[in-house]
Amino acid sequence: MPKMKTKSSAKKRFRVRPGGTVKRGQAFKRHILTKKTTKNKRHLRGIVNVHEGDMGSIAKMLPSAGL
């Protein structure tokens, strides 16, 4: 049986941390930013962890990550 391939879109969007958590960038920060307040854009900065409920689907998309 061949090896399972990693989803290209997932490997560009997610990074696995040494502790087993997965980090991702915030959404809603690409365009239509003029309507959004400075406070809202500031809160969308930075990296956040993936929620536990989404970890199953992330693990299927990243088979070599060992999640």
Curated annotation (Swiss-Prot):
What GO MF annotations does this protein's record show? Answer: structural constituent of ribosome
Xref: SUPFAM superfamilies: L35p-like
- Entry keyword Ribonucleoprotein: yes
One Pfam family of this protein, by short name? Ribosomal_L35p
Which residues are the signal sequence here?
A: none
Source domain of life is Bacteria
* Xref: Gene3D superfamilies: 4.10.410.60
Q: What is this protein called?
A: Large ribosomal subunit protein bL35
